[in-house]
Amino acid sequence: MTEPTQPQAAVAADENQIVAERRGKLRALRDQGIAYPNDFQPTHHAAGLQTEYADADKEALDAKALDVAVAGRMMLKRVMGKASFATVQDGSGQIQFFVTPADVGAETYDAFKKWDLGDIVAARGVLFRTNKGELSVKCTELRLLAKALRPLPDKFHGLADQETRYRQRYVDLIVTPETRATFRARTKAIASIRKFMSDADFMEVETPMLHPIPGGAAAKPFVTHHNALDMQMFLRIAPELYLKRLIVGGFERVFEINRNFRNEGVSPRHNPEFTMMEFYAAYTDYRWLMDFTERLIRQAAVDALGTATIRYQGRELDLAKPFHRLTITQAIQKYAPNYTDGQLSDDAFLRGELKRLGVDVTQPAFLNAGIGALQLALFEETAEAQLWEPTFIIDYPIEVSPLARESDTVAGITERFELFVTGREIANGFSELNDPEDQAARFRKQVEQKDAGDEEAMFFDADYIRALEYGMPPTGGCGIGIDRLVMLLTDSPTIRDVLLFPHLRRED
């Protein structure tokens, strides 16, 4: 482990000294028997007061003489002789406390002068406006509710280190308004989605997180062991097969918002634990799904941000416009127009081109890959990152879509789409395969690929086949990456910015 630099060591020493001093103050509070009281109830919140009385002048507030009780974290303190000020932040926003010994008493005022930034404080008093126009609480009672032992980051620089922001998200939330705004927008977006689904007669359900057989996606699972049953189990990579069992059971419209787990790499777009919404609707197909998904995402933006026009990484994006639709080869030729139809149908050319682009075509997934899989790989190298505006890529090859219904008109193609925005996949949906014999054959093909070394190939799920044998109506199903959608709505460049506690290496 590398030794800390001199500046780092100095900062650590200073912080240790501050913590020691604050612990001394806490000991004094314990001796007085008032260290951590729990008998204060706020009557108002900062943001509500700021909003309701934004236009009230000093005279109007004095005439109203509104009694308030407010609590929060002390973010700023100015001691000025016989009158002092504190900026206090609660869960909604900030408001100023005005403190004088005449109002709170000399003993409380002297104690207040020793309180530290970060302390949780509470006040009762009257709402008024200072001579400088600041809405404030003129405190008649002031209390310390919880002592902060660690100092907050410098108010001018905040948390400069990105990893520290992720590792100590609690501090990031205290000092970074933008972080708090991101997660409030996330909550609004998810609430919007739930309402949208409910209004469309979908039923929210919960399906298992521990699976005896991983399925529903091409991914490497986390493996665990169930001691009581003495059996190997897997954290779910997708809820798909369980949700479709519910369609078989007669619930014609279902959805689930929950976590998936995939034992794969970490990147700006990937976290091993992530949130997805999957939904399934009987008597629909992938065309219906595209229209529905487009409306859902547009509404989530409006409810979370107040508009369907957003800015992402400096570029404007209008989600109110109709989303584009392209096939895989159309997308390739749009962004790499030198490729001819003949080249895109030539196995040897595609393999050579992928190799030229740095793709290892000797991987197990490529050993028996057909034209469709090779075209998809070329699309990922040449076109995917260029799909800035919302674009449905449609008609995926059957060999990479083992759960999707085959097209009635084009052999080897499925009724499947993926939605890309700002070069990232946001959603994946298709007309569901409901033919049990076809599904069993595709599972067997996946097992062959797994035996050949493809760790992401699917297992054979005999119980799911049994469910299909009872008859599943024609169905459309879609999965939407909630984290990536929130990245888009909050102008966040990495998935870690929209996860409260993203996975990091252990802190040694």
UniProtKB/Swiss-Prot annotation:
Query: Which GO terms of the cellular component aspect does the record hold?
Result: cytosol
Q: Name one GO biological process term.
A: lysyl-tRNA aminoacylation
| Coiled-coil zones | none
Q: Which residues bind Mg(2+) 2?
A: E425
PROSITE patterns xref list:
AA_TRNA_LIGASE_II
User: E.C. number, please?
Assistant: 6.1.1.6
**UniProt protein name:** Lysine--tRNA ligase
Q: Which organism is it from?
A: Burkholderia pseudomallei (strain K96243)
